[in-house]
From Swiss-Prot:
Residues 579-636 are annotated as: Integrase-type zinc finger-like. Pfam families: Pol_BBD (PF22936), rve (PF00665), RVT_2 (PF07727), TYA (PF01021). Disulfide bonds: none annotated. This is Transposon Ty2-B Gag-Pol polyprotein. The active site is at residue 457. Residues 1625-1767 form the RNase H Ty1/copia-type domain.
Length: 1770
């Protein structure tokens, strides 16, 4: 039957997965594997070995089963899943027999997929799919697929069948894949498929047929199990499961690459060089090999490459081995230069050598210069070869006198070594430096030298030594001239005597010459003969004429040597030898001064510029150049730090043919962020190709018009000033250059626009390098001067002026000289940022000072004046009326510049600038210290509690951790916004005021979170895109910025005042980022609940959904294009859900008796807007909800710079009793302060070691802390926190791996004293932890939801605590800590084993540890999108670090979990919750009263009663209670606040404490206070009397209502569904900058579980738009809570949304889109429609008077406030 089907359908070709090809094997000209000839025998042996393991049954062609081959059982081939091979059809044994499957017995059940499209093949005809089983392959030369598509017949030509093709073995591991591919390709070749296998280039000889394709696919699948394939193969097959040939092609290419790598390594290891080929050829060969390895991700270090090269050097190059033997920092380029120089010298000497020496020379002279890091050292090597193998015996002493040369003026030295070698003393000129260098002629092999010995030379008429150390009575040489045997001069530096003291006490002295230009010290026998001393070479001794032995001589190599131990050292000064007159350096300008004045240019440029007279009025001889080449400027090191240089030679050669100013290079840099609007954000630079003249122009944007104006200006300038026309401008392909406007501009003026090629920025090297240079200078100048960042372009302009005036290393002239301009007048230049006093020609009063402090920037372009920055006026002026401020204290304070106080030198250079100011302005130092417990004295008695280790007590010197800062104000500067990490500018080093960033929102209790644009500062969580949030990263210490900031993030705390995030930021390991001032964080196990915990607050502009867990809420199918209008009300069960059912059981006010004075709906009126905006903390601009007029009106606001100005010249106009200026005042602008609120510092709640123990005068408390200390030590040792077997030396450990540690102490609410040993994670190096690890705690919404569900379902609530939780988590990194202070081991370290509290990774390690245990051992699952919420069928767990809250219907289920936890962790039961009566809990700061099946009350009465009185706020001053936290109509005055510096810090600190505590309380349960908390939090930096009074009023209201509780009652048991409702409201335009306030309240089954009040992130233009914004912010969190409720309680859920804006509901329900005013409004409304419809959300109207969310958006009258809150807070 099957054969008939095949005959009827010739297109359905069949193939077998195991069948042999019955055709002639196709030969291949090139092996695609490129296997070398040496590897082929091994390959054949492996193949033969495999073949030998398979036995062939006689009489058949079948191959029996073997272990290399797929088992015939069906289970041997794993079923495809998760991207494995697709399985369309299975081959059964019967089908296999029917299809002539004879060769491999019965195969396993094989898959046979339909053909899919592949890059190398054609798509088959869909009418003829592949069959479900494949017959044997029978064609040898089938037609390609093309012919089959034309319905042609399959060729029937048959060739000889190969019946015994051995299959490849089965792939056994991923590592053996490439070896298996070799066998598999050999198998395909033997199966006559070699011509369709692609080579490494992807080329094939012919197209395959369907039959061959199926054959290859099935055999590959059979012998290569999917799970054993490499990842890259799986990725290919997941895209196209049948694309086997692509896999083979890439495998061949990778194997060829591996083969080439092996060849390159072999070639590199076997390098040899003897000079027979050119050095350039050798260098190219080696560099090519190294480059190929680098392209294959194999980096060969310079040291390894040099070692391999040195190993292969021979001949004259062999000496380099000894030279580099001791070097550790070998450079490959340096070694190549050495080899090249030796090669060139040999080549020259071979050409110059006389013919009689070319054949019979005994000497080969090689000279080589060796670079050195300190000085230049020239070493000459003379390789001496004798014709005799015998040692060279010294001649008799009388032979030396037969020299043909005069001993006085023309002494002859034989076999000497000559070259120039300088002394190592950097402070003195070297010996012989004025002598000419002789050409080396004769050396001895360096291997023959005997250290610390003199070579005895019978042919030398003079004794020569290299060191003056042994030279007595030395005098500088002025007349003696020595030559060697080749009559080459040897420079002599000094003449003296060598004093010998031989072993029998004989002393003698001989004349000696000093020269450093020889390789060895030579001792002349002739000189010894003059002292009656001879050398006996038979007995190897020095003897007197009477036979007395004076000293032994040593034979070493071919020569005899005398030890230098018989020489008497001299004690002469090198000054007497050098004879250098150093008096010339007197009155010279120090080089660091010139370096600063000339814009921190490099040494060579400055020196060359002075030589070429590019700088006038200053000569090269006027500068002290000693050590100038090695001078390291700290500012240059910081400002000019770079990764790598641009590639040299990237510029094309033909560009050099242009004339000056005909060829320009241009590029744009920017933007620079966080600058005032007046400061440019970009600059565009131009460089002339010929002269290298540079121009820079500032830009505020990159618009076409701005760029065009600059080009017009530069072309006109060049034409008029230099009489030249620009022909070509080279640019990159940025859109600012490639636009039509600029292209037309170039075309009209005949200018050629030359663009770089795609992705070839290196071709634009001239402009790129200029930008890099200018930015290096900019960073350096700003860092050196300490000027604010908005002056960055002034630094660039100053750098341009200097660079145009200096000679570059590649040019002989400066750019100005090339352009025909005069050199730079040095008298017109001041150091950038030089303090000056500017004359004020128009003072406000005749008695005011006439001088204004300023800072010099750069010479003016438009006048002969100077551009000077005046911080007090916040502007720059162009003036000549200035004088340099001569004040040593006004110099740089970043470094200790002993040589940079150049008042006298600067006066000489700028004498004409001195005029009218002579006073100095004194300054004080500014310090910052960071210390730990190890600086304090330990008073712990070791006998109080036995410890595991033998700890010894050691006292330490007590130091005070906190030092009161002394403010140092160098000048009056404005404060710029913080520069992002991508900015080029450094932070101002002297900024004494907080950096301000706009952060403006509070969420659920006044959450104030960072909202920076930098990724590392991101702290928001968007539910729609699932961004994980982070805690604020950069908190400002407004009270004491100069104190130590700690960021002990792993101490378990909670953010107070704001929606607690379910995830922590990327760089942290816990949910809190502490950076405390003057303190360390709380260490209470439930520190958020600690009695003295003060919250961290941060202002944010994100919406509520940004801080809630993200749930996948993608819309369902209805969002397809055929659904034009979404349904507002869901279809299912909509008939059962009504507005009444949604409103039922909600705690809404009862309005049956409406009061005539009720003003709860006043917010819907539209009063007239006042012309003057009044920013109110309690109600906005005019009324409780002020709206703009109906007519559109443009609103313009003054640009208020976000700064806090320090004004020194502000006079007290109210009191003129004294003409003395008052103390420094802070002038605070309201809008700037509101925009500047970024974070609030937590108040320290813990004690340091010295406070708790060392200096604690309360002996009882001290004893308790000591007891807690020992308890903590024992716990640490019991948990094996560190390695107790070994102490490590600090000097042996990488400092990055060392973490400082300290003890912190705290008193918990229950009265117990707690000690905690923590690591200083705030100073932990980033390389020591993984920033991607997440540390999570339960979200407060999740806790409230769980509590609500527990009440409705009568759950038991069990509270647990795990002691020392972090110490159960192992640490992966290698970290070390300092031992506890009582051990006294300050110089030792301990190796950490566990995740110590304080480490950045500890929280993440603990989270992963406990999560894994709960999932694997307790059968729990984490709820998706809600971290730290775990559940199974019976129990729900909320995890907050080491606190666990268990909810279950069955108490036994809780106890089962507890039993499992106790097996692994020290678990304490805080409250089992078994009682049926009222149970009191203290859960994460909430005081909860719970009676199952009845009610639950949440409050904080005890905590507030204890904490509020400690805030130093007068409570109940008038003896009556407040009824509301604030009243409408109270506005904050906009007048600037002028306040003393110290008073300002004190008041800001007070605001931090008050608002912080209020935010914490509001976040937990007092949602009715959120609006007031949020608004006051925005005024933390504006602590006026009015703001403080309003804050006191809020605290007073909290005190009066401290007994209020959030009351929940059990839901009616008749309700079959869970009902989740969000109530939304917005107050339009009642915040600064016309921002709107939005608020939402969330209720589950009628119980309020959360609330949010925040300023809208966008400026809304109408009331409706504000309401839409509020609704859109509520929906994501509503959806996420819905998912959580459904996970925790399987009942159906109804979601409702209530708003008092009928227009918003109308827009959601309307199908008319023409009413939308603009695209933004329309897209937001349409998105809202989709979200409402797609999430089964019911939207209903609620009366304004019943809208309890009204309290979140505006201040309300007392009656209205009570009416809206008394049903849920009472």
């Amino acid at each position: 039957m099957e054969s008939q089907q095949l005959h009827q359908n010739p297109h359905s070709l069949h193939g077998s997965a195991y069948a042999s090809v019955t055709s002639k094997e196709v030969s291949s000209n090139q092996d695609p594997l490129a296997v070398s000839a040496s590897n082929l025998p091994e390959f054949d042996r492996d193949s033969t070995k495999v073949n030998s393991q398979q036995e062939t049954t006689p009489g058949t062609s079948a191959v029996p089963e073997n272990h290399h081959h797929v088992s015939p059982q069906p289970a041997s081939v794993p079923p495809p899943q998760n991207g494995q091979y697709q399985q369309h059809g299975m081959m059964t044994p019967n089908k296999a027999m029917a299809s002539n499957w004879a060769h491999y017995q019965q195969p396993s059940m094989m898959t046979c997929s339909h053909y899919q499209t592949s890059p190398a093949y054609y798509q088959p005809d869909p009418h003829y799919p592949l069959p479900q089983y494949i017959p044997p392959l029978s064609t040898s030369s089938p037609d390609p697929i093309d012919s089959q598509d034309q319905h042609s017949e399959v060729p029937q030509a048959k060739t000889k069948v190969r019946n015994n093709v051995l299959p490849p073995h089965t792939l056994t591991s991923e590592e053996n894949f490439y070896t298996w591919v070799k066998f598999y390709i050999r198998f395909l070749k033997n199966s006559n498929l070699g011509d369709i296998i692609p080579n490494d280039q992807g080329e094939i000889k012919r197209q395959m047929t369907y039959e061959e394709h199926a054959y290859i696919y099935n055999t590959f699948q059979a012998f290569a199990p999917f799970h054993l394939l490499p990842t890259w193969v799986k990725q290919i097959l997941e895209i196209n499961y049948a694309d086997i040939l692509t896999v083979l092609c890439k495998s061949v290419s990778k194997m060829q690459t591996n083969n080439q790598e092996l060849k390159d390594w072999i070639a590199l290891a076997n390098l040899e060089y003897d000079g027979s080929t050119s050095a350039d050829t050798f260098e190219i060969t080696v560099s090519t090999i190294i480059q190929r390895l680098k392209e294959n991700n194999i980096n060969v270090s310079d040291r390894l490459a040099c070692q391999l090269i040195l190993k292969g050097l021979s001949g004259d190059f062999k000496y380099l081995r000894n030279q580099y033997r001791t070097k550790t920092n070998m450079k490959l380029s340096q070694l190549f230069a050495e080899i090249q120089l030796i090669y060139d010298e040999n080549k020259i000497m071979n050409l110059n050598k006389p013919s009689q020496y070319k054949q019979h020379s005994e000497y080969k002279n090689v000279s080589r210069t060796s670079p050195n890091t300190t000085n230049t050292k020239v070493t000459t090597r003379n390789y001496h070869r004798t014709n005799s193998s015998k040692p060279r015996a010294a001649k008799a002493h009388n032979i030396a006198t037969s020299s043909k040369f005069s001993r006085v003026n023309n002494d002859h030295i034989n076999e000497s070594t000559v070259s120039s070698q300088y002394l190592s003393d950097d402070n003195e000129l070297s010996l012989g430096q004025q002598q000419k260098e002789s050409k080396p002629t004769h050396t001895i092999d360096s291997n023959d030298e005997l250290p610390d010995h003199l070579l005895i030379d019978s042919g030398a008429s003079q004794t020569l030594v290299r060191s003056a150390h042994y030279l007595h009575h030395a005098t500088p040489n002025s007349e003696i001239n020595i030559v060697d045997a080749q009559k080459q001069d040897i420079p002599i530096n000094a003449i003296g005597n060598l004093h010998f003291n031989f072993q029998n006490g004989t002393k003698t002295s001989i004349k000696a010459l000093h020269t450093p230009n020889i390789a060895y010290d030579l001792l002349s026998l002739s000189e010894l003969a003059n002292q009656n001393i001879t050398a006996c070479f038979t007995r190897n001794t020095l003897e007197r004429s009477d036979g007395t032995v004076l000293a032994p001589i040593v034979k070493h190599g071919d020569f005899y040597w005398l030890s230098k131990k018989y020489l008497i050292p001299s004690h002469i000064s090198k000054l007497t030898i050098n004879n250098v007159n150093k008096s010339k350096s007197v009155n010279k300008y120090p080089y660091p001064l010139i370096h600063r004045m000339l814009g921190h240019a490099n040494f060579r440029s400055i020196q060359k510029s002075l030589k070429k007279n590019a700088v006038t009025y200053l000569k090269e001889s006027d500068i002290e150049w000693s050590n100038a080449s090695t001078y390291q400027c700290p500012d240059c090191l910081i400002g000019k730090s770079t990764k790598h240089r641009h590639v040299k030679g990237s510029r094309l050669k033909y560009q050099e043919s242009y004339e000056p100013f005909q060829y320009l290079h241009t590029d744009i840099f920017g933007p620079v962020h966080h600058l005032p609007k007046s400061a440019p954000s970009y600059f565009i630079s131009f460089t002339d190709e010929k002269t290298r003249f540079q121009w820079v122009y500032p830009l505020h944007d990159r618009r076409e018009e701005s760029i065009l104006n600059v080009f017009t200006s530069i072309l006109a300038f060049i034409k008029n000033q230099f009489n030249a026309r620009v022909l070509v401008i080279q640019m990159d392909r940025g859109s600012e250059y490639t636009n039509k406007t600029l292209h037309k501009f170039f075309t009209n003026r005949g200018i050629t626009a030359c663009y770089t090629t795609t992705a070839d920025s290196r071709a634009h090297g001239v402009a790129e390098r200029l930008n890099r240079t200018l930015l290096n200078d900019c960073r350096t100048l700003l860092h050196c001067s300490g000027l604010p960042n908005h002056l960055w372009f002034s630094a660039v302009e100053f750098s341009t002026i200097i660079r145009n005036s200096l000679v570059s290393p590649k040019n002989d002239k400066s750019a100005r000289q090339h352009a025909g301009l005069a050199g730079l007048d040095i008298t017109t230049i001041l150091p950038f940022g030089q303090p000056v006093i500017v004359n004020n020609h128009n003072p406000d009063s005749k008695i005011h000072p006439r001088g204004i402090p300023g800072y010099a920037l750069h010479p003016s372009r438009n006048s002969y004046g100077y551009i000077i920055y005046l911080p007090s006026l916040k502007k720059t002026v162009d003036t000549t009326n200035y004088v340099i401020l001569q004040d040593n204290q006004s110099k740089l304070d970043q470094f200790n510049y002993d040589t940079l106080t150049f008042d006298d030198d600067l006066n000489r250079l700028t004498a004409h600038n001195q005029s009218f100011i002579e006073q100095n302005e004194t300054e004080q130092s500014y310090d910052q210290n960071t210390e730990s417990d190890h600086d304090y004295q330990s008073e712990i008695e070791i006998n109080s509690d036995p410890l595991v280790n033998d700890f010894s007590s050691q006292s330490m010197n007590p130091l005070q951790l906190d030092h009161e800062p002394v403010q140092k104000v160098r000048a009056l500067k404005e404060v710029d916004a913080d520069i992002s990490e991508y900015n080029i500018l450094p932070s101002p080093v002297r900024s004494r005021t907080p950096h301000i960033i706009n952060k403006e929102s509070t969420e659920m209790g006044g959450t104030i979170e960072s909202d920076t644009t930098s990724p590392r500062h991101s702290s928001t969580f968007t539910a729609r895109n699932q961004k994980r949030p982070g805690s604020p990263n950069d908190m400002i210490d407004l009270t004491s910025q100069d104190r130590v900031n700690y960021e002990l993030e792993n101490i378990k705390t909670t953010r107070l005042g704001g929606t607690e995030e379910p995830y922590i930021q990327r760089n942290s390991d816990t949910n809190i980022k502490y950076r405390t001032t003057n303190s360390t964080p709380s260490i209470d196990d439930r520190s958020p609940d600690s009695d003295s915990t003060t919250p961290i607050i941060s202002i944010e502009t994100k919406a509520a959904c940004d801080n809630t867990p993200s749930i996948d809420t993608d819309p369902p199918e209805y969002r397809s294009s055929d659904h034009a209008t979404p349904n507002i009300m869901p279809d299912k069960s909509s008939k059962n859900v009504t507005a009444d059912s949604i409103l039922d059981d909600l705690p809404l006010p009862d309005l049956t008796n409406k009061s005539p004075t009720d003003t709860s709906d006043v917010s819907k009126d539209i009063p007239h807007i006042h012309s003057r905006q009044t920013n109110s903390s309690l109600g906005g601009m005019d009324d409780s909800n002020v709206l703009t007029t109906t007519k559109s009106k443009k609103r313009s606001l003054e640009d208020n710079e976000t700064e806090i100005e320090v004004s020194r010249d502000t006079w007290n106009n109210k009191n003129m009793r004294s003409l003395e200026p008052p103390r420094s005042k802070k002038r605070i602008n309201l809008i700037a302060a509101i925009k500047g609120v970024k974070s609030i510092k937590p108040v320290r709640t813990t004690l340091r070691y010295d406070e708790a123990i060392t200096y604690n005068e309360d002996n009882k408390e001290k004893d308790r802390y000591i007891e807690a200390y020992h308890k903590e030590i024992n716990q640490l040792l019991r948990m094996n926190t560190w390695d107790t077997n070994k102490y490590y030396d600090r000097n042996d450990i990488d400092p990055k791996k060392v973490i400082n540690s300290m003890f912190i102490f705290n008193k918990k609410r229950d009265g117990t004293h707690k000690a905690r040993f923590v690591a200083r994670g705030d100073i932990q190096h980033p390389d020591t932890y993984d920033s991607d690890m997440q540390s999570n705690t339960v979200h407060h919404y999740a806790l409230m939801t769980s509590l609500s569900i527990a009440l409705d379902n009568d759950y038991y609530i069990t509270q647990l605590d795990i002691s020392s939780a972090y110490l159960y988590a192992d640490i992966k990194e290698e970290l070390y800590i300092r031992p506890p202070p009582h051990l006294g081991l300050n110089d030792k370290l301990l190796r950490l084993r566990k995740s110590l509290y304080g480490l950045k990774q500890s929280g993440a390690n603990w989270y992963e540890t406990i999560k894994s245990y709960l999932i694997n051992c307790c059968d729990m699952q984490e709820v998706r999108g809600w971290s730290c919420v775990f559940k199974n069928s019976q129990v729900t767990i909320c995890l907050f670090v080491d606190d666990m809250i268990l909810f279950s219907k069955d108490l036994n289920a809780n106890e089962k979990i507890i039993t499992t936890l106790k097996k692994q962790y020290d678990t304490k039961i805080i409250n089992l919750g078994e009682s049926d009566n009222e149970i009191q809990y203290d859960i994460l700061g909430l005081e909860i009263k719970y009676q199952r099946s009845k009610y639950m009350k949440l409050g904080m009465e005890k905590s507030l009663t204890e904490k509020l009185p400690k805030l130093n706020v007068p409570l109940n001053p008038k003896g009556k209670k407040l009824s509301a936290p604030g009243q409408p109509g109270h506005y904050i005055d906009q007048d600037e606040l002028e306040i003393d510096e110290d008073e300002y810090k004190e008041k800001v600190h007070e605001m931090q404490k008050l608002i912080g505590l209020a935010s914490y309380v509001g976040y937990k349960f007092r949602f009715d206070l959120l609006y007031y908390i949020n608004t006051l939090a925005q005024h933390i930096l504006f602590p006026s009397r009015q703001v403080l009074d309003m804050t006191y009023e809020l605290i007073q209201f909290m005190w009066d209502t401290r007994d209020k509780q959030l009351i929940w009652h059990k839901n009616k048991p008749t309700k079959p569904d869970n009902k989740l409702v969000a109530i939304s409201d917005a107050s339009y335009g009642n915040q600064p900058y016309y921002k709107s306030q939005i608020g939402n309240i969330f209720l589950l089954n009628g119980k309020v579980i959360g609330g949010k009040s925040t300023k809208a992130s966008l400026t809304c233009t109408s009331t409706t738009e504000a309401e839409i914004h509020a609704v859109s912010e509520a929906i994501p969190l509503l959806n996420n809570l819905s998912h959580l409720v459904q996970e925790l309680n399987k009942k159906p859920i109804i979601k409702g949304l209530l708003t008092d804006s009928r227009s918003t509901i109308s827009i959601i329900k309307s199908t008319n889109e023409e009413k939308f005013r603009n695209r933004f409004f329309g897209t937001k409304a349409m998105r809202l429609r989709d979200e409402v419809s797609g999430n089964n959300l019911y939207v209903y109207y609620i009366e304004t008077k019943k809208n309890i969310a009204d309290v979140m958006t505006k201040p309300l009258p007392i009656k209205t406030f009570k009416l809206l809150t008394n049903k849920w807070i009472h």
